[in-house]
Regions:
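Conserved class I S-adenosyl-L-methionine
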Residues: 1-47, 50-58
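A C-terminal cap/extension of S-adenosyl-L-methionine-dependent methyltransferases
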Residues: 195-246
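Short alpha-helix
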Residues: 173-191
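A short, conserved alpha-helix within the catalytic core of class I
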Residues: 127-135
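A conserved beta-strand element that flanks and buttresses the S-adenosyl-L-methionine
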Residues: 119
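Conserved beta-strand signature within the Rossmann-like core of class I S-adenosyl-L-methionine
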Residues: 144-151
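Class I SAM-dependent methyltransferase SAM/SAH-binding core
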Residues: 59-107
Length: 246
């Protein structure tokens, strides 16, 4: 049974996926393209012959790419039935290695110890973190890994933008704060957190394609140097979280 919050999230994402145009802020995502590169590098290295869950798969873009890495099976779930319908059109759902389901990430239908990897992008901050981390822990196999890209809620200018554009986000979303990382550390082991999007976001108008831009390469390297200092971590836009079930 869905909670009131779950219902609001489902309605928000169904409405979002029913629109013909994407959100304006999508233009900013090139500033954290290096997080996506690291995300898929991890999956490229670890997906072969693994059972994988795309947790909040949306319309299936990540899942389609991970299929190239030869998983044993990959399952995508999302609370939005509109998203799953779109995903089935994008991905060959007749492939026996793929399953796409409408499901509640906070209370999935899977058995204990089902997956080698659970991954997602921009999903945890839409959920009750305690509940979903316990659920991920339950469905991961011992030694299984979680992998998530999530926004941070610690940069005051980004938070101001969020307040000025409430219709672009769901009512219940909560970009991650320091206490959320403590929650993760209490539930998983071998945790690695990498930060992205400070200088690359500030100067995003001066470069075009990040993968071809020497300016972007300089900025992302400067970011990684600055993120060694705690105060700059709070100015990052997003993080890549890798952790393991004990």
């Amino acid at each position: 049974m869905l909670s009131e919050k779950n219902i609001r999230e489902k309605e928000f994402h169904n409405k979002l996926q029913s629109k013909s145009k994407g959100r304006f802020e999508n233009i900013f995502y090139k500033a954290i393209s290096n997080s996506s590169n690291d995300f898929f590098d991890f999956l490229r290295t670890n997906s072969n012959n693994s059972e994988i869950l795309d947790y909040g798969c949306g319309i299936g873009h990540s899942l389609k790419k991970v299929l190239e890495f030869n998983p044993k099976k990959i399952t995508g779930i999302d609370i939005s039935d509109v998203s799953i319908q779109k995903a089935k059109k994008i991905i060959n759902n007749s492939d026996s290695t793929v399953e796409l389901l409408v499901d509640n990430c906070e209370k999935t239908k899977f058995n204990n110890n089902s997956f080698d990897i659970v991954y997602g992008t921009g999903i945890l901050h839409h959920l009750n973190l305690e509940i979903c981390l316990d659920e991920i822990n339950r469905i991961l196999k011992p030694g299984g890994k979680l992998l998530f890209i999530e926004p941070l809620g610690t940069n005051p200018l980004i938070n101001l933008y969020r307040k000025l554009s409430p219709n672009s986000r769901s009512k219940d979303e909560h970009p991650l704060l320091g206490r959320d990382f403590e929650t993760i550390k209490n539930k998983f082991v071998k945790i690695d957190i990498k930060y992205y999007g400070f200088l690359t976001l500030i100067f995003f108008p001066i470069y075009s394609s990040p993968n071809k831009s020497s300016i972007f390469r300089i900025l992302k390297n400067l970011d990684q140097f600055l993120f060694k200092i705690n105060i700059f971590k709070k100015l990052a836009w997003s993080v890549l979280i890798v952790a393991e079930k004990n």
